[in-house]
Amino acid sequence: MAREYKIEDYRNFGIMAHIDAGKTTTTERILYYTGKSHKIGEVHDGAATMDWMEQEQERGITITSAATTTFWKGRDGKMRRFNIIDTPGHVDFTIEVERSLRVLDGAIALLDANAGVEPQTETVWRQAEKYNVPRMIFCNKMDKTGADFYRSVEMIKTRLGATAVVMQLPIGAESDFKGVVDLVEMNALIWRDESLGAQWDVVEIPDDLKAKAEEYREKLIETVVEIDEAAMEAYLEGNMPDNDKIRELVRRGTIDVKFHPMFCGTAFKNKGVQPLLDAVVDYLPSPLDIPAIKGIDFKTEADIERHADDAEPLSMLAFKIMNDPFVGSLTFARIYSGKLEKGSSVLNTVKDKRERVGRMLQMHSNSREDIEEAFAGDIVALAGLKETTTGDTLCDPLKPVILERMEFPEPVIQIAIEPKSKGDQEKMGLALNRLAAEDPSFRVKTDQESGQTIIAGMGELHLDIIVDRMRREFKVEANVGAPQVAYRETITRQTEEDYTHKKQTGGTGQFARVKIIFEPNPEGEDFKFESKIVGGAVPKEYIPGVQKGIESVLSSGPLAGFPMLGVKATLIDGAFHDVDSSVLAFEIASRACFREAAKKAGAQLLEPMMKVEVVTPEDYVGDVIGDLNSRRGQIQGQESRGIAVVISANVPLANMFKYVDNLRSMSQGRAQYTMTFDHYAPVPSNVATEIQAKYSGQK
């Protein structure tokens, strides 16, 4: 079967935003207008197509990013293929956003016109910056009370440090919002309410907006000509670019991430969605417009690139594992190069295992269609893969490559969990392992001392939903303990330790001597190992044993047994024995060496500090600040946002449990907050003593 759509007609994009900015509703409208849905699903009815897990429909939030393929006819009459990924906006599910952005070519950032740039908008924006994803902005909810398009434009500059190129102006606001002014064509689009937004009239720009439209068109042209010398010169000589040239320059600037075209509308009231779809075609990149994916040659470790071309060897990235009630485990993958046929064998280069593609599916939210083959640029779901996990590379076994890996955040909260009936122990283990395979930010471990099962994740809601899914999907009822903070330990000063491991038990003995400098790692929280051995005091083949020995102890620090961060170790001297030395002997020596050194190196307890933003009516500001201070919070600042006040603070996670209930009663339900992990910080000594006393007995 040949390729149906040329690769230049593909648009792989995601929709990203703060929770409640209207992402799922916008996606529903896109599916409706592109003909994939016959009835519009509303989130508040629990009927949205993209939100297919039961918990999503109950809570009205999106948890997993559903991938959907649909089609749209551009302004030129040509059909385009859209692969859309709907991502969650709740901070506990940031991992979903991160891995979606990794495999997308472009994104639409949604803003709530009333709130503008919110904390989670900043978080997902930063993630998109990290992967250099071209973005457009859609200022949604223009029909909402307090909607202010121009303030949102300003906030993009002040809060995100980004340049928005305004492409449309709103006609009216709040309940009077009727349509938009198109600043390229210089006309107005007014939607007909009775047609569910499917039809609109193109009319002249209203008189009261003509001057503003001229002003903003001028700004638009000024910004876009800056990226092209010839266009800039022509403009300075008084020659204005024509409309096609403006679109071409906007496209170039968007793909190069120089600026972000901005549109407005209200997805819920069905206004402004079709011009947004035209803009996806006009301004977001096809797989051919973005740089080739980088990787390393599996055999030679040389840097290589794979281009978006069916003729190149197959390479794809598994970016999500999902448990499907009908098909079993599904692996979502983005094909970067080559083509994939059903039944073919691929190599997982991260695990060095071959996998056979049993079935290949194209997903529409939670319905599916079997396909025989897929091509460069496609996003597909594969059934039958046994070894593959999120972030793995799958490729042609004859031309193996390892694509750039994804990075996943460390969990900040953990709870003990046990099945309500002893007979469910095995079932619970199976369920948790399945869920951990789907979500790399969720971890499961067994506490060595107590034998308890511990689950760890990105927040209370994250773990609530895991427990909930276990009950619904795997029929396992569980008891959960109180949430516990994922503390860490570090060292604060340099120390040098000389340790000799000697054991003689008849026959071959064990001997290893190491001299190591331990100090805080100036480069960050990771462990860094260096060898400065000269003259063969420790043979080269034993040095990996020294590193492995230290790493094995980092999982349990000297104060209360928490994992250690930010340690640097430098091996400077040692000794070996021709017969009795081995890698294992050096592993044992370095392990004991670090245990001794850690006691002398000023071990310190660290706790996760959270960036908290509270949006509250002015009446409650004093109470909110007083309460945050009582939680050991450090107030970072406050600003007005409309009639509300936004308070920013850094607060230890340990003091934020059940904060939502406190805030609700303090503000009579009128204040809201968001919380994201910010950094690890030293625990004050009086609090550290309590924590050590509590945990030392458990470890």
Swiss-Prot record:
Pfam families: EF-G_D2, EFG_C, EFG_III, EFG_IV, GTP_EFTU
GO MF annotations in UniProt: GTP binding; GTPase activity; translation elongation factor activity
Binding-site positions, GTP: 17-24, 86-90, 140-143
Sequence similarity: Belongs to the TRAFAC class translation factor GTPase superfamily. Classic translation factor GTPase family. EF-G/EF-2 subfamily.
Compartments, record wording: Cytoplasm
Lineage: Bacteria, Pseudomonadati, Pseudomonadota, Alphaproteobacteria, Hyphomicrobiales
Ranges for domain tr-type G: 8-288
UniProt signal peptide: none
Superkingdom classification of source: Bacteria
Stated role: Catalyzes the GTP-dependent ribosomal translocation step during translation elongation. During this step, the ribosome changes from the pre-translocational (PRE) to the post-translocational (POST) state as the newly formed A-site-bound peptidyl-tRNA and P-site-bound deacylated tRNA move to the P and E sites, respectively. Catalyzes the coordinated movement of the two tRNA molecules, the mRNA and conformational changes in the ribosome.
GO cellular component, one term: cytoplasm
Entry keyword set: Cytoplasm, Elongation factor, GTP-binding, Nucleotide-binding, Protein biosynthesis
PROSITE patterns listed in its UniProt record: G_TR_1 (PS00301), G_TR_2 (PS51722)
Main subcellular localisation: cytoplasm
Organism: Rhizobium etli (strain ATCC 51251 / DSM 11541 / JCM 21823 / NBRC 15573 / CFN 42)
Identification of the protein by name: Elongation factor G
InterPro entries: EF-G-like_DII, EFG_II, EFG_III, EFG_III/V, EFG_IV, EFG_V, EFG_V-like, G_TR_CS
A GO biological-process term: ribosome disassembly
